[in-house]
Amino acid sequence: MDTYDTGIYTLNGQLIRNLSETRAAELRNRMIGFIFQSFNLISFKNAVENVALPLYYQGVSRKKRNAMALEYLDMVGLKDWAEHMPNEMSGGQKQRVAIARALIAKPQVILADEPTGALDSKTTVEVMELLRRVNLEGLTMVIVTHEPSVAEATDRIIRVKDGLVETIEKGLGHV
């Protein structure tokens, strides 16, 4: 979480100013799930281990975190790929593993940076349907994208130009 010069920034009632790196990492791990455009999977860990990683940092036992990771892989349609390494997966499969990893710690907010940027159109629709389903279950989702079809699948579109909000409009709310 970045520092700031003016104003007040809170996360779930916690003032985010002068936090230690450890406390900031704890808050990030508990409150925010990240989906990266480049997936950021750990190359020497299989799908289950990649998905289970946030739970490791929360002190969850290996047996429990691996069982939960399998559930989340099943949720994204990849249970059969649990033991596969990232280099054995397609871009869409890697992205779904990354989504499962972002969701497993049950964060309150998901920050998704170009979550469909590396995907074909069919997989883009599948990923957006999954994100929409999770959003409808009550999870706040912030998606950064340059793809008009992805933006329009959201409830609200905030267009930013040169670091400033240019417009706020209603999205279609479906893929």
Where are these regions (language model features)?
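ABC ATPase nucleotide-binding domains
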Residues: 172-175
